[in-house]
Amino acid sequence: GTKLSLSDLRGKYVILDFWASWCVPCRKSHPHLIQINQKYKGENFVLLGIASDRKDEVIKKAAQEDKIDWPQMNIYEKRDQQKQLNEMYDISAIPTKILIDPEGKIVVKYVGDSAGLDRELEKIFKK
């Protein structure tokens, strides 16, 4: 697909969703992300999936099954990029959700359960 860089997303709030098709807790978190995406779409907000699967087709299939329509990036084959992202965001497990502010700073990070994302977004967008 289209090339997308995190620097392209500057000026917006971004949720990075680190996940994989084989990760059951990751997949179970998608309905919650769909609600968040619907609520804040059109605001200064973007959701980006960062998946780690052997094949892009597997990610596409999982995204279709889970009805997620935000951009997905597969970092499995891109070892350097994967290592860089894992180090930059200190990813030790998935699912991990990271909320980044318009300046590119991490607001909050959730490993596993991301229920607290709602509170953070409500504070930001007053919704």
Stretch-by-stretch model annotation:
Residues 60-103:
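Short, internal strand/loop/helix patches
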Residues 1-14:
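A short beta-strand-turn-helix
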Residues 17, 47-51, 74:
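Short beta-strand segments
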Residues 10-11, 18-35:
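Conserved redox-active cysteine motifs that mediate thiol-disulfide chemistry
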Residues 30, 34-37, 56-60, 86, ...:
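Extracytoplasmic/secreted envelope proteins and their assembly/folding machinery
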Residues 99-127:
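Thiol-/selenol-based redox modules, centered on thioredoxin-like
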Residues 10-12, 42, 68, 91:
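Active-site acidic short loop of glycosyltransferases
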